[in-house]
Amino acid sequence: MTLPLLGPMSLSGFEHSWFFLFIFIVFGLAAFYVMMQVARQRRMLRFANMELLESVAPNRPVQWRHVPAILLMLALLLFTIAMAGPTNDVRIPRNRAVVMLVIDVSQSMRATDVEPNRMAAAQEAAKQFAGELTPGINLGLIAYAGTATVLVSPTTNRYATKNALDKLQFADRTATGEAIFTALQAIATVGAVIGGGEMPPPARIVLFSDGKETMPTNPDNPKGAYTAARTAKDQGVPISTISFGTVYGFVEINGQRQPVPVDDETMKKVAQLSGGNSYNAATLAELKAVYASLQQQIGYETIKGDASAGWLRLGVLVLALAALTALLINRRLPT
């Protein structure tokens, strides 16, 4: 949790848990304080004239006298928690990752069930995704229909990606498997030259399509989409699929209306086989929401961060309160 002014506070993930042994010292101090109070009470009872004692003793509630000491012990406990080094989950922008944006440009993308058409909506949402993706991520772009073409190799230059998105052209047929294999090759190539760690950079494929694979017709073919998805899983590259459109989509081909309903099932299967997630969108607003969700997943990583500062600040405040109450109640600091 995070408290205003104090910052993140956690009671888990302690890096120096042996500091909790200091609690025994705090308990020892508390026991010593109790013993001192008992001894003090006994000394007071030695006065023969109790009426005289009551007349000269400060007229303050006895129970309030112990508040400063209690606050002091509480401050020591808070300092103990801080020294034990609690941690919490912190989301930070990735500065070493590869994302391949793979977009279907087959003729079915002419369908106007999504205004103004599927392609134009895809371009607008993809450009927004590219613009909002964290700067350190290398983003590449592949367009595919009957063949797959790397339009932009993975780069942090978002202008190149947006410019290429504006120039997408329609083409015949749909080779989803080839597009995935092409993306994997691009990821492997850039992963070999990106430094910053012993392991290859984390990678993700974002596959955008609206229809079934037509080359080959069997997705389990050696060059099919399912085979490519299994290969992606073996290489540790999950595929996030976005199926875009409605079941009412159609295009005009040679003067005839050809239905092009969105194919959610194939995309879900590709995501499942690769270890990724599947999404579907039927409007531009839904598509932008999907991309926003992906941006949060892809653009950030969760690490363990220090959460001791909040406990330290709280301990200082309680310690200051102990000193203040000691001066107000007992007219001296607690002993």
Swiss-Prot record:
Membrane-spanning residues: 18-38, 67-87, 133-153, 309-329
Top-rank taxon, per record: Bacteria
GO CC terms of this entry: plasma membrane
SUPFAM superfamilies: vWA-like
Keyword Metal-binding: no
VWFA domain segment(s): 98-294
Membrane topology: Multi-pass membrane protein
PANTHER family given in the database record: LEUCINE ZIPPER PROTEIN 4, SPORE GERMINATION PROTEIN
Family listed: Belongs to the UPF0353 family.
Name of the protein in question: UPF0353 protein ML1808
